[in-house]
Amino acid sequence: MSKSSTGRDERIGDFVIENEIGKGSFAVVHKGYRLQPREPVAIKIVIRKKLTPKLLDNLEGEIAILKAIHHPNIVELKECLKTEHQIYLVMAFCASGDLAQYIKKRFDIYERAGMAEPDSLTKGFKPTYPHPVDGGLNETIVRSILTQLAAALEFMRARDIVHRDIKPQNLLLQPPDAAFLALGNPREIPQMKVADFGFARHLSVNTLAETLCGSPLYMAPEILRFEKYDAKADLWSVGAVLFEMTVGKPPFRAANHVELLKRIERGEDKIKFPDERSAGSLAREAARRQELGEAPLPPPHPVSEDVKILIRQLLRQRPVSRMSFDDFFASPVISDFKAFIRPRAQPEAVERYEDLQRSERSVIIPSSGIKHVSVSSIEASTQQPGVQPPVSTATSPPALESRSTQEASPKAITGETIAPNKTPREDARPPRTLPRAFSAKYVTGEPPQPEDLEKRVPPTMTRTPSSPGIPEGSLLSGERDEAPQATTEHFGSSKGGEDSFLGKEYVLIEKQSVEVNALADELAASPQSRLGLASRRPSRLSRLSSGPLPSAPGASPPTAPPTILSSKPIRIANNTNTASTGAFALPPGSRPSSFPRRASLSSSGSPSTRQGGQVITNMDAVASTQSNRRDGNASSFPKDEVSVLGQRLAGFGLSGSGVGGGPSSALAKAISMASLRLFGVPSGVSLRDAAALVRTRAQRRGIARATDSLDEAEMTLLSTLEDLGQKAFVLSEFADSKLAHFFPDGPHQLSQELDSSTATSGISPSRNSVQGSARRVGSISSSSSSAVDPVAAEAASAEALMLYVRSLAFLQRAITLTKRHVESRSRPGVPAVTSAELNDVVQWLRARFNEVYDKADFARSRCSELPESAQQVDKLIFDKAVEVARAAATDELENNREGSGWDPSHCLLAYETANSMLSSLLDPGEDAMSLSEGSILMIDGYVKSINKRLWTLQEQFGGGVGAVGAAGASPVGVDAEARPGVSRSRTESP
């Protein structure tokens, strides 16, 4: 809180909170003061409920760094306090604002700070260091601020701290203090302090995306290219800041970071300064401004040659060509300014300062906790004592405790891991032996009847590498360094040593996550072809978010028979903000989730009705399947064979020494019409209303073909993106179910606050009522979770992690296809014009990618080893798909009788889900693995059997309850021989 309702200042501990001076996404900065002794402070108030685990880690890192270091050019953290709802960082107050404001307004630092100016600076005296008329700062001031920044960076570098967010907004200014003046610095020059160490520990997906969207002007090109980068990225930022101080504007400017990178690359390391413009160019500019009636520009001021050389050496695109830190610290620009101020310096002050710079590196240990305090209102006469809030470990967010981190190493691979809640100094525990819960008994066959589906036992499935090595697009990093484009950030992990905060210079960022956010930003900023409000075809994903569409004239091609809806449509506000209303959100009766999702469990390769005789095919999936058939072999799948994803899980800090698997699913224990739940999710995935989703497929695709707003290439792309999104969705839901068995709280569950906020955004009351019941079921699970086996919980977390990684691979593949499509339509200097629908799809993919990434990080934090069941992720998916299909077959066999009033929606959604999961196995995706020929034939047999059952149900209930579409429509993906009378050419028509 910042102010009381009556406008009185508030008190936190020994500090009084005054007016607000800054604001961000997760924190507000207020001016304040300490009561005894009275001194001004800046109080950063962080709202705890807004912090994700990643942001909490960032805050923890910032606190740890600021507590461990003390330097005159780094903002001092005086105290850290917390209440039940806020965290308060009390820092030194820099009264003159930040460098960005100073460059822009070039104000008097004393006047800005509200202080009396020294006698030499009173009005009437000529400024000692006047600023250039055309912009920028006085060169002496520039050299001073650069020298101070270099001192701070040198101090941090000796302690293995890389700031990663150097920009003028994070360089705070104040009038010089006594210690600063004792070093010989002039009184007219501001003292600079580096602030905001939120990025110093590691760069998560959400913060990187925010940085890319907010302030890319000072980012190194290797970051903009999504490459592995080292500490030299800070040097590029220093060069950009130095250029802006000298000239008055950044060296490169653009509307978005994609265009910014293009301009940097076009510059070819040729940095031009205003004073280097030719006389002819200046004359043409003056004539142009005169014609427009604008005031003439002042002549550019000269820039010293040594400053130009330094800037050009810092702003080199390739890090290997960029000057080193040692060369930067010894550059003439810095050494000359040190020589300039040394004659006026006090020897004792210089000696103390140099000792500080050379001091032994500090051991930075994350804070083990922050003391609780009370917040009270400051009265004019008396103060009301605040009540100490209770310390609740059950409901409040966790304290900023030390989290162990580990790096992919031989010890991690052999099983010598560190316990999740222990620091690196504690003894490593031996690997656990996990219980084996998955059998490997499989037989082949392809019976089409539900009885056979129910009795069938699947054969062993084998996935073999189709190409050696690790693919470029893989989501997990391997051991090779020659492919920097394939690097990854270890989910929440970094090397932590006894005397090192980072341990290594290199910081691995998750390339694919950056690409997803980058492409989404590019499309959001690019021109889009927009239709009129009445004529624009709704987005495929927005239609999925909106539920079934009401019948309306012109909503489908004239040739399409009407689709009968047996229930009211689900209404969800059509919002382009994908973070709040996501496409593919679950229908009513869904299990709570961290984001509203719809179970669009169909895929382009599964049965679905169509309108107008049109079928949307997934060309990419077909090609992948054909490739699998060519490259596969009939070898069996040994139990101890580990997939590429499993082999490379060392990037997550996990070992592969465990054996066994996770808990059995609730679906295998009891299946009934009243309690059928996909994936056996304890918090409840009721299928009562799920048929509404399936019924909308024909309408959705019919409308997609009813307009000529998009060309064929984009329509094919959108269809492929939907298919990949659906595969990613079912795998993510499967992973959610594994976590929900053991963890009632986390990103895989929906908070009550999000539930209520979603209700106000347009979701029907029926959804809210069902979600309430789902939360009640979840509470039952949470009540029993305290008695679960921690070994089983760890195994389930590892399995969920592998499923999330597979889901991320499909989402990344969708982004890659979109990126190629956009690049093929771009021209130099002219961005591609994309449809609003494609932008909506990409925004949804971005939201889902970040969501699944956070879930994967959550799962990784709950496991330290990789059990055999998680290593064989293909087997996990196959087992569950067959289990879901069997449950549907049993339900159909026992209840589908004439006159029984049976609702087929449960079976339809279950069959669709199983089909999508099996289709994901036939699509190798990012792990560059191909199934053996026997496995492909076996899975294909299951897919055909499921398709036949789907078609039978659609034929039987085509005009009644649970209808998926109009009678006579052909399902997508069913082979011609699967249904008599349907030609292959018709089934494969675009």
From Swiss-Prot:
Active site location: 165 (proton acceptor)
Subcellular location per the Swiss-Prot or TrEMBL entry: Cytoplasm; Preautophagosomal structure membrane
InterPro entries given in the database record: Atg1-like (IPR045269), ATG1-like_MIT2 (IPR048941), Atg1-like_tMIT (IPR022708), Kinase-like_dom_sf (IPR011009), Prot_kinase_dom (IPR000719), Protein_kinase_ATP_BS (IPR017441), Ser/Thr_kinase_AS (IPR008271)
Membrane topology classification: Peripheral membrane protein
Ranges of compositional bias, category Polar residues: 375-408, 750-771
Keyword Metal-binding: no
Molecular function via GO: ATP binding; protein serine kinase activity; protein serine/threonine kinase activity
Induction per the UniProt record: Transcripts accumulate during carbon stress conditions.
Gene Ontology CC annotations of this record: autophagosome; cytoplasm; cytosol; phagophore assembly site; phagophore assembly site membrane
Gene null: resulting phenotype: Prevents vacuolar accumulation of autophagosomes and affects survival during carbon starvation.
SUPFAM superfamilies with a match to the protein in the record: Protein kinase-like (PK-like)
Keywords: ATP-binding, Autophagy, Cytoplasm, Kinase, Membrane, Nucleotide-binding, Protein transport, Serine/threonine-protein kinase, Transferase, Transport
Domain Protein kinase: 15-334
Compositionally biased residues, Low complexity: 529-554, 587-613, 772-784
Reaction catalysed by this enzyme: L-seryl-[protein] + ATP = O-phospho-L-seryl-[protein] + ADP + H(+); L-threonyl-[protein] + ATP = O-phospho-L-threonyl-[protein] + ADP + H(+)
Binding site for ATP: 21-29, 44
Xref: Gene3D superfamilies: Phosphorylase Kinase, domain 1, Transferase(Phosphotransferase) domain 1
PANTHER family associated with the record: NON-SPECIFIC SERINE_THREONINE PROTEIN KINASE (PTHR24348:SF22), SERINE/THREONINE-PROTEIN KINASE UNC-51-RELATED (PTHR24348)
Family named by the database record: Belongs to the protein kinase superfamily. Ser/Thr protein kinase family. APG1/unc-51/ULK1 subfamily.
Function: Serine/threonine protein kinase involved in the cytoplasm to vacuole transport (Cvt) and found to be essential in autophagy, where it is required for the formation of autophagosomes. Involved in the clearance of protein aggregates which cannot be efficiently cleared by the proteasome. Required for selective autophagic degradation of the nucleus (nucleophagy) as well as for mitophagy which contributes to regulate mitochondrial quantity and quality by eliminating the mitochondria to a basal level to fulfill cellular energy requirements and preventing excess ROS production.
Protein name: Serine/threonine-protein kinase ATG1
Lineage, uppermost ranks: Eukaryota, Fungi, Dikarya, Basidiomycota, Ustilaginomycotina
Gene: ATG1
